[in-house]
């Protein structure tokens, strides 16, 4: 099925010509009255405008959030859980619309937004609705007459900065636990993908009290920095590149507030020789695991961008893998048959293409792809890159630096020790993959990898109840899982004596 392009008669959603900020339950134009063009990566054409906000708009959003914080923070867990479930219901009722909008805004295939992005977002809201209902305080009996009570209280007003690779899903990862915990939010979407989060906000606006959720669009230095450096937020959560994460951490340290940072990665995907002991469905699954580098156009922090293959397996495995890469269907993201769509921006496409040049200059061999994809017709102005496979060694820049595109760098290893050394030879530690039929090896090797998530005989699964986060320069803190509530709460201890007698110190 091919969905109609925006602005045409058969389009399932009509975008507004211009989108304002959502502050205090209403749509408000930016204080300075400026807007910027929003381009769809599918064709490279402008399809609407978004507010180009500044510190003045962030201030208005913070005013609204602080005005709502006390009342929202005092709602019961049952009330907040009910609202989160209603949000999930609203998203479910509008799943196709949100999937369409996300594909237009980001350029990813609509088959992924229909099957993964939006269903996962729905599930995350339901999951944290359940988590907050199940959360309990605790008490400790110190002695016969002294009790320590522990209460979970919201932080208050928090800031959230969302990336452009999964706008709705990454927003949900932050919104769901923050709302469940009783916080008010000022959220800034990425300037590359400002609209899908606003469409989501339109759909759920009536479900939340004014001021609880505020969405302010704009550029990083003009809107993101004033939010992250504000003395009026109790926490900042950020997903994006490591260099920006360092700046966010500096701002937070000046105000002594906690941060959650989900940053870059250069994830190893390790294939042991025993996977080829039979040519069966598991071997085919491992081949698919290799090709996961192209999912979401490689624009995933955990993209398996380094494939480490046992030397005795290499020839047979790479032949099968390249055959699978060759049949990846690239085309219009609005076609449900398309497997790989457009990169999110022309800047990102140019970065990816520059790394292809770097790989060649370093002496890497191009096994597949290696160039811009020319799709013709109305897609000619879009941002398309061929799925690319390089063969090289782990010291090359294409092995060490995050490309954030459909590019995988392949090398071989002799034994398990060398594989572990190669896997950990990186500044990053977000994701990784291990493929083996040996359960003991899978456990041993998985524990040895210095990464926050180790997919074992699978890849790119993101359930709500599995903790996600990085080691090393891939970030601080965790997202998802009920432990995420801890990142948006603080513990109040009431230490109470029920003894009428004096303590006897003075």
Swiss-Prot record:
| EC numbers, comma separated | 1.2.1.3
UniProt: NAD(+) binding residues: 218-224
What broad class of enzyme is this?
A: oxidoreductase
Whether RNA-binding counts among this entry's keywords is: no
Record-linked InterPro entries: Ald_DH/histidinol_DH, Ald_DH_C, Ald_DH_CS_CYS, Ald_DH_CS_GLU, Ald_DH_N, Aldehyde_DH_dom
Which reactions are catalysed by this chain?
A: an aldehyde + NAD(+) + H2O = a carboxylate + NADH + 2 H(+)
Write out the GO MF terms. Answer: aldehyde dehydrogenase (NAD+) activity
User: Which superkingdom heads the taxonomic lineage of this protein's source?
Assistant: Bacteria
Q: Please report any disulfide bonds recorded for this protein chain, giving both cysteine positions.
A: none
Q: Where is the active site?
A: 262, 301
One Pfam match, given by its short name, reads Aldedh
Keyword check for NAD, yes or no.
Answer: yes
User: Which UniProt keywords are listed?
Assistant: NAD, Oxidoreductase
Q: Which family does it belong to?
A: Belongs to the aldehyde dehydrogenase family.
- Please report the name of this protein according to its UniProt entry: Aldehyde dehydrogenase
């Amino acid at each position: 099925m091919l969905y109609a392009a925006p602005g045409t008669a058969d389009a399932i959603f009509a975008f507004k010509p211009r989108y304002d900020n959502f502050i205090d339950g209403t749509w408000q134009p930016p204080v300075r009255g400026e807007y910027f063009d929003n381009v769809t990566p599918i064709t490279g054409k402008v399809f609407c405008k978004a507010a180009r906000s500044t510190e003045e708009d962030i201030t208005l959003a913070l005013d609204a959030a602080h005005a709502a914080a006390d009342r929202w923070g005092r709602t019961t867990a049952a009330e907040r859980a009910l609202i989160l479930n209603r949000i999930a219901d609203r998203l479910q009722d509008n799943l196709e619309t949100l999937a369409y909008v996300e594909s237009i805004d980001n350029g990813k295939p609509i088959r992924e937004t229909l099957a993964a992005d939006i269903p996962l977002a729905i599930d995350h809201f339901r999951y944290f609705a359940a988590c907050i209902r199940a959360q309990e305080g605790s008490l400790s009996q110190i002695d016969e007459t002294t009790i320590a009570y522990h209460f979970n209280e919201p932080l208050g007003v928090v800031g959230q900065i969302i990336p452009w690779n999964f706008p709705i899903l990454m927003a949900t990862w932050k919104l769901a636990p923050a709302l469940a915990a009783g916080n008010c939010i000022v959220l800034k979407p990425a300037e590359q993908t400002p609209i899908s989060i606003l469409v989501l906000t339109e759909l759920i606006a009536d479900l939340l009290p004014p001021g609880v959720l505020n969405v302010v669009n704009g550029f990083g230095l003009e809107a993101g920095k004033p939010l992250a450096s504000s003395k009026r937020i109790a926490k900042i959560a950020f997903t994006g590149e490591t260099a920006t994460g360092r700046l966010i951490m500096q701002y937070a340290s000046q105000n002594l507030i906690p941060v959650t940072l989900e940053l870059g990665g250069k994830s190893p995907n390790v294939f042991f020789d025993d996977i080829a002991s039979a040519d069966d469905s598991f071997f085919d699954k491992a081949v698919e695991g290799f090709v996961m580098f192209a999912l979401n156009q490689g624009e995933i922090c955990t993209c398996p961008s380094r494939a480490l293959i046992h030397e005795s397996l290499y020839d047979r495995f790479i032949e099968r893998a390249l055959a699978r890469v060759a049949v990846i269907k690239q085309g219009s993201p609005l076609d449900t048959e398309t497997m790989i769509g457009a990169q999110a921006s022309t800047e990102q496409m140019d970065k990816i293409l520059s790394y292809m040049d770097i790989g060649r200059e370093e002496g890497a061999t191009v096994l597949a792809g290696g160039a811009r994809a020319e799709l013709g017709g109305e897609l000619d102005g879009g941002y398309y890159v061929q799925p690319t496979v390089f063969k090289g060694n782990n010291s090359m820049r294409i092995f060490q630096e995050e490309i954030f595109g459909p590019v995988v760098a392949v090398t071989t290893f002799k034994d398990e020790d060398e594989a572990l050394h190669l896997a950990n030879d990186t500044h990053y530690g977000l994701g990784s993959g291990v493929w083996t039929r040996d359960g003991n090896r899978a456990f041993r090797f998985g524990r040895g990898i210095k990464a926050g998530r180790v997919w074992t005989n699978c890849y790119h699964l993101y359930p709500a109840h599995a903790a996600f986060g990085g080691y090393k320069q891939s970030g601080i803190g965790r997202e998802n899982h009920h432990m995420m509530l801890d990142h948006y709460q603080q513990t109040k201890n009431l230490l109470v004596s029920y003894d009428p007698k004096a303590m006897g110190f003075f």
